[in-house]
C-alpha cells in the first residue's frame, strides 16, 4: 500500500465518508483550477481528482496537475479517461478497468498501454474497478459501457465481488458527470456488502441530502465535479463535506 492510499484509509478512521473534488483538465485554466482546488481543500476535500471521460492532452493534464499542487496540500490523483490522461507530477492514479465496457480496449488494452508511463512517472497506482451506472452520459458513450441499470443493485454487487476476487482495492460506482440522478442507496448498500475495499461513488450528487444518502449507504468517498465547474458554491461544497464527515 502506497502513501496516498494509506493517507485516505487513515482519514476514513476520522470521517465517515471522504469528499473528492473532480477538476476536468480540459475545461480548466490555471487560475480556475487553482481557485477550485484551493476552495475544495478549504471546504474539506481529502483529494483532488484530475481528468475526464473525453479525450485529453497529456501536456495539458500535466500543467493542470502542477498548478493544483502549487495551490493545495492534499493528494492530486489522476482520473484518466484514456492513456493521454496519464501524466507526470500527480501523487497517484486511479488505475481503472471499465469492467462493464463492451470494448475490451477500456477493460485491459488501455491499461497495458498506460502502465509503462505510470511506472516511468512514479505514480502510485490505485487498482480500481470502474463501473458505469445508467446510460446517456459522456462516460457511458465514450467508454462503450453496457450501463448497469439504476434499479439492478445485484448486478453492480456481482461486478464488485468479481473486482474483490481479482484483487482490486477500489470500486468506483459512476453515474456519470452531470447525471440526472445519482447512484441509488440500495445499489451502494449491495456493493458495500459484497466489496470490503474502498468504495467511491460519483455522478449526480448535487446537494447535502444526496451526499448524506450515499454516505449512509456505505460510500467511503463521494466525488463532486460538475457542480463546481458550473459555478457551484464552495459554501455548498463545505456543507456537503459536513453532511458526510461525521464518524
Curated annotation (Swiss-Prot):
Q: Where is this protein found?
A: Cytoplasm
Cystine bridges: none
* InterPro entries assigned: GGGP/HepGP_synthase_sf (IPR038597), GGGP_HepGP_synthase (IPR008205), GGGP_synth (IPR010946), IGPS_HisA/HisF (IPR050064)
Keyword Transferase appears in the UniProt entry:
yes
- Top-level EC class, please? transferase
Q: What is its EC number?
A: 2.5.1.41
Q: Which Pfam families match?
A: PcrB
Q: Which reaction does it catalyse?
A: sn-glycerol 1-phosphate + (2E,6E,10E)-geranylgeranyl diphosphate = sn-3-O-(geranylgeranyl)glycerol 1-phosphate + diphosphate
Which GO biological process annotations does it have?
glycerophospholipid biosynthetic process
Question: What are the record keywords, sorted?
Answer: Cytoplasm, Lipid biosynthesis, Lipid metabolism, Magnesium, Metal-binding, Phospholipid biosynthesis, Phospholipid metabolism, Transferase
Provide the binding site for Mg(2+). 24, 53
- Pathway linked to the protein: Membrane lipid metabolism; glycerophospholipid metabolism
The entry's cellular-component GO terms read:
cytoplasm
Q: What does this protein do?
A: Prenyltransferase that catalyzes the transfer of the geranylgeranyl moiety of geranylgeranyl diphosphate (GGPP) to the C3 hydroxyl of sn-glycerol-1-phosphate (G1P). This reaction is the first ether-bond-formation step in the biosynthesis of archaeal membrane lipids.
Report the sequence similarity comment from the record: Belongs to the GGGP/HepGP synthase family. Group II subfamily.
What this protein is called in its record is: Geranylgeranylglyceryl phosphate synthase
Question: Organism, per UniProt?
Answer: Cenarchaeum symbiosum (strain A)
Its taxonomic path starts at: Archaea, Nitrososphaerota, Candidatus Cenarchaeales, Candidatus Cenarchaeaceae, Candidatus Cenarchaeum
